[in-house]
UniProtKB/Swiss-Prot annotation:
Function: Involved in the biosynthesis of the chorismate, which leads to the biosynthesis of aromatic amino acids. Catalyzes the reversible NADPH linked reduction of 3-dehydroshikimate (DHSA) to yield shikimate (SA).
Binding site for NADP(+): 83, 129-133, 227, 250
Record-given protein name: Shikimate dehydrogenase (NADP(+))
SUPFAM superfamilies on file: Aminoacid dehydrogenase-like, N-terminal domain, NAD(P)-binding Rossmann-fold domains
Pfam families membership: SDH_C (PF18317), Shikimate_dh_N (PF08501)
Name of the gene this protein is made from: aroE
Keywords annotated in UniProt: Amino-acid biosynthesis, Aromatic amino acid biosynthesis, NADP, Oxidoreductase
Length: 284
């Protein structure tokens, strides 16, 4: 990578963030597309967020990515939000359009792009969890024409989850069904009629636990996805593959949400296949 007086910056902003794989992905992409850019990780305190956003304009940056805890906190400092960012209520990408700062959320698009030969339009989805990643998948599915969504959370989280689903219905007219994860017969019934089953919880990061009981029977055409990529194959995905179902981990979502951001910043397509190869070598 050659840096000079014309090099434009992009950064990921979060706390903590030094462990991030985003600089690896984006700097590879800058190099592969002969784009004069550099991507760094900025670990900042909340009190520095306003100044950090102001620096996007000040230094004529491409923009920034955001991770926890700043995806929602950044919104008041932006000029405009995309449809999906408004629906999700969180921003993971800020684009500098001639000094106008526009907030996007590329997580949902990245998720659906990483699913092999699958489109969500007209399909039924069962989603486990209702955190940040789940919200982005939910909102994008609705924007892309999903026909039915069943969200399962632990019964203690149902009250906390409902207001967001009500807000989604108010803004889109789409009603999401909310169910308790402990209700195994309901879980089985919903999965049986689904085209896509997604684990958007952190259950499985320990390499031992699974978000669903192993006696659940999966329909043979069901695609199973997990947003976790470390471990590369969670117990949930192993279980799905043992039933003969296609199963996808979260590494593709990480890559394709980055590719969406890269295109918004540069107008260029990220060479995802080439970078995917490097990522799988790193994590497999």
């Amino acid at each position: 990578m050659k840096l000079d007086g014309y090099t434009r910056l992009a950064a990921v902003v979060a706390n903590p963030i030094k462990h991030s794989i985003s600089p690896f992905i984006h700097n590879r992409a800058f190099e592969a597309t002969a784009t004069n850019g550099a991507y760094v990780a900025w670990e900042i305190e909340a009190s520095d967020l306003a100044e950090t956003v102001a620096n996007i304009r000040r230094y004529q940056m491409f923009g920034i990515n955001l991770s926890m805890p700043y995806k929602e906190q950044v919104i008041p400092y932006l000029d405009k939000l995309s449809d999906e960012a408004r629906l999700i209520g969180a921003v993971n990408t800020v684009v500098n359009e001639n000094g106008n700062l526009i907030g996007y959320n590329t997580d949902g698009k990245g998720f659906f792009k990483c699913l092999p030969s699958f489109t969500i339009s007209g399909k039924k989805m069962t989603l486990l969890g209702a955190g940040g990643a789940a919200k982005s998948i939910l909102a994008q599915a609705i924007l892309d024409g999903v026909s039915q969504i069943s969200v399962f959370v632990r019964s203690v989280s149902m009250e906390k989850t409902r207001p967001y689903l009500d807000k989604l219905q108010e803004q889109t007219g789409f009603k999401v069904d909310l169910c308790a994860l402990e209700n195994v017969s309901e879980l089985q019934a919903r999965i049986a009629e689904s085209d896509l089953l997604v684990n958007a919880t952190s259950v499985g990061m320990d390499g031992q636990s699974s978000p669903v009981p192993e006696n659940i029977v999966l329909p043979e055409t069901l695609l199973v996805a997990d947003i976790i990529y470390q471990p590369f194959e969670t117990p949930f995905l192993k279980w799905a593959r043992s039933q003969g179902n296609p199963a996808v981990n979260g590494l593709g979502m990480l890559l394709y949400q980055a590719a969406e951001a890269f295109q918004l910043w540069t107008g260029k397509e990220m060479p995802t296949e080439e970078i995917w190869q490097s990522l799988t070598e790193k994590y497999q």
